[in-house]
Amino acid sequence: MTLGSQIATQLLDIKAVYLKPEDPFTWASGIKSPIYTDNRVTLSYPKTRDLIENGFVETIRAHFPEVEVIAGTATAGIPHGAIIADKMTLPFAYIRSKPKDHGAGNQIEGRVLKGQKMVIIEDLISTGGSVLDAAAAASLEGADVLGVVAIFTYELPKASQNFKEAGIKLITLSNYTELIAVAKLQGYITNDGLHLLKKFKEDQVNWQQ
């Protein structure tokens, strides 16, 4: 079993991911979605957490061997980023969604040197907007952002477009395609449910029709 399938299995087992194609969730954006993900839950399960953190380390070493600093997005990327930095004996920083409105007004907490090669950690990619904003903020502070590594992606076309336009490399440990395949194999969803989940990936507006 691939790392992506192993992680997908764990996400389903610990209920970090819920699939309800016949009774969809409503996202904050208003989109009706057959999937809901809360990867913060992974922190409460040592086996799952260890699988994910080791996967992050292996992936970063394979794709970004020149990395000099790990950064986590606030708040979901902070605990994972801190653990990864510890495992790799690298500096760690985190990036706020916006600068503080008091004190020094920092958006990046921690010390990042000019030109330092950075990998940003995120837990979930939907459209990628928030982590790309974080990458832009880090670049403005002088960091050399090598890329983003995340636990999971919905594989939405908008995310691919956004990362391409930003010129930022994205790698994820698991993805929507792997997860729904595992879900069908393990009996979490029916054939009809799988069909709806596949339609959602292609068209987030009209998938129920």
Curated annotation (Swiss-Prot):
Keywords: Glycosyltransferase, Magnesium, Pyrimidine biosynthesis, Transferase. 5-phospho-alpha-D-ribose 1-diphosphate binds at residues 96, 100, 102, 122-130. Orotate binds at residue 126. One of its GO terms (biological process) is pyrimidine nucleobase biosynthetic process. It comes from the Bacteria. Its EC number is 2.4.2.10. Signal peptide: none annotated. It catalyses: orotidine 5'-phosphate + diphosphate = orotate + 5-phospho-alpha-D-ribose 1-diphosphate. Pathway: Pyrimidine metabolism; UMP biosynthesis via de novo pathway; UMP from orotate: step 1/2. Homodimer. PANTHER family: OROTATE PHOSPHORIBOSYLTRANSFERASE, URIDINE 5'-MONOPHOSPHATE SYNTHASE. This is Orotate phosphoribosyltransferase. It comes from Streptococcus pyogenes serotype M28 (strain MGAS6180).
